[in-house]
A protein has these predicted regions:
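Intrinsically disordered, low-complexity protein-interaction/activation regions
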Residues: 8-168
Length: 168
């Protein structure tokens, strides 16, 4: 048995509500993007993988998740996506547009914070086990298996920190 909690008789509405609020794996809210970071990075909506026109749009979203909601400048994002190779301004605008339009098509406009040329992820508007760990809702050893966004090199620093924390 893998119970998240239990209720002792007499059963009351309050006891049921309390246990539902403290589920190990909470019930996903409708219209909430689900982001998986442990292992490969993947984005799901209603249980299905989200398709982006450009693979770099998915990488852009992955980096924003890795930054944990911090606003990132276009210059920083281009340096990560193109590894300091200049001359990708127009391509970056297409990638950014693809990300925003894909999220809009899923009615997930509130996932990205946009402020004066900076982008960040709105942590409260997505479901992500990494964010649950950061917020203290789950223990690292319950969600981390030694891999974090394995397809992206920028994730190596975070992965090494998670590995160190999990080894303690």
């Amino acid at each position: 048995m893998h119970a998240s909690g239990y209720i002792v008789k007499p059963i009351t509405t309050e006891k049921v509500k309390r246990e539902l609020l403290n589920l190990r794996k909470p019930v996903l809210e409708v219209n909430k993007l689900q982001i998986e970071v442990f292992g490969n990075f993947e984005v799901y909506f209603e249980g299905k993988p989200v398709k982006f026109k450009y693979s770099k749009a998915k990488e852009l979203l992955a980096y924003l998740v890795d930054r944990k909601g911090a606003l990132c400048s276009s210059k920083e994002l281009m340096a990560i996506l193109f590894e300091d190779d200049d001359g990708h301004g127009t391509y970056f605008k297409s990638i950014r547009k693809d990300l925003l339009e894909t999220l809009k098509s899923l009615d997930c406009n509130n996932v990205i914070n946009i402020q004066r040329g900076k982008l960040g992820i709105s942590k409260e508007n997505v479901y992500c086990t990494y964010f649950d760990y950061l917020d203290g809702k789950v223990k690292l050893n319950e969600v981390y298996n030694g891999e974090y966004m394995t397809q992206y090199s920028f994730s190596e620093y975070t992965n090494s920190n998670l590995y160190r924390l999990n080894s303690k």
